[in-house]
């Protein structure tokens, strides 16, 4: 796999100021599609919205962004209906019609993630199970639920096997969920989705997006055991920078290529039917802190 990537990030500076959430609007159709992703978004705190950075990250999302992927923990602290109404809706809710969500552990702090499923409705997938797939721009997208069993023999694992088999002719595949299999953040590596990661690797998937650790990190293409695989490996991104309080990085994990933890932002992916480009866009208005490109697996 060819790639053009930035070097290891230095210290990021958090800019002051804010941005208003954009108006909802129709996405612009083009030969490629632009997809924005982040998790760990709207923190209501105990006295209303304490962390206005969800407004600032919402301000990065443009009418030309076809899809918006949430990587779990859509609201804090407990994923309650009032949090979706008071904190998510005024920020990222401005483009709700373009959101394809995934749930996080804080969404499940309200029984069965009920408020999450009520808020997103059909966009959250069928039967309130929290996993589903769809196609856009020549890509196959898979939203998974890392709060539910995804090991070998589970219903989610069997569903993913069938979904990948049914879409084996699709050249480019992207999957996303909440808990990272690999992370240099304080939560560290979480093996609950390792079987899923291996399934995706075997099927030739290109990208995995996750949140949970409130940092930005990009890993080299690898398999579920952490072995580098430049030709067929899955490139994973942690984008837990959607608005909640940022964490500190820990010792870098093997194959971590870029990481930073001092600014909120979103990952913007430009996807064509044969390749992809990525850029981490910070809220301070500076140039992307990480950007690159690669072809889909042949």
State where each predicted segment sits.
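Short hydrophobic/aromatic-rich beta-strand segments that constitute the beta-sheet cores
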Residues: 143, 277-280
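Extended active-site neighborhood of metal-dependent phosphoesterases/phosphodiesterases
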Residues: 46-48, 76-172, 187-202, 207, ...
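Short, solvent-exposed aromatic-acidic interface loops
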Residues: 279-289
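N-terminal Sec signal peptide cleavage junction
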Residues: 16-20
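Bacterial N-terminal signal peptides
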Residues: 5-15
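N-terminal active-site segment of His-dependent metallophosphoesterases
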Residues: 22-84, 150-155, 162, 183-184
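Residue-level marker for buried hydrophobic side chains located in beta-strands
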Residues: 35-37, 68-70, 101-102, 175, ...
């Amino acid at each position: 796999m060819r790639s053009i990537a930035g070097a290891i990030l230095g210290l990021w500076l958090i800019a002051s100021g804010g941005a208003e959430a954009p108006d909802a609007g129709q996405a612009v159709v083009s030969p490629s599609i632009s997809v924005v992703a982040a998790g760990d978004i709207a923190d209501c705190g105990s006295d209303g919205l304490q962390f206005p950075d969800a407004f600032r990250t919402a301000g990065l999302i443009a009418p030309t962004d076809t899809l918006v992927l949430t990587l779990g923990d859509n609201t804090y602290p407990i994923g309650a209906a009032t949090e979706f109404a008071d904190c998510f809706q005024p920020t990222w809710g401005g483009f709700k019609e373009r959101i394809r969500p995934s749930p996080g552990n804080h969404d499940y702090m309200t029984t069965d993630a009920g408020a999450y499923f009520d808020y997103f409705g059909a966009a959250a997938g069928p039967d309130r199970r929290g996993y589903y797939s769809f196609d856009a721009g020549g890509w196959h997208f898979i939203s998974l639920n890392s709060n539910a069993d995804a090991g070998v023999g589970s219903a989610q694992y069997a569903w993913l096997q069938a979904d990948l088999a049914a879409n084996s002719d699709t050249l480019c595949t992207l999957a996303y969920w909440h808990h990272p299999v690999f992370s240099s953040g304080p939560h560290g590596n979480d093996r609950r989705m390792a079987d899923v990661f291996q399934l995706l690797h075997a099927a030739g998937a290109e990208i995995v997006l996750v949140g949970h650790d409130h940092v930005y990190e990009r890993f080299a293409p690898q398999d579920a055991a952490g072995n580098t695989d430049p030709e067929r490996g899955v490139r994973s991104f942690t984008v837990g920078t959607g608005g909640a309080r940022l964490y500190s990085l820990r010792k870098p994990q093997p194959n971590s290529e870029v990481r930073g933890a001092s600014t909120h932002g979103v990952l913007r992916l430009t996807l064509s039917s044969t390749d992809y480009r990525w850029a981490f866009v910070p809220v301070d208005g500076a140039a992307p802190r990480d950007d690159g490109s690669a072809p889909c697996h042949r």
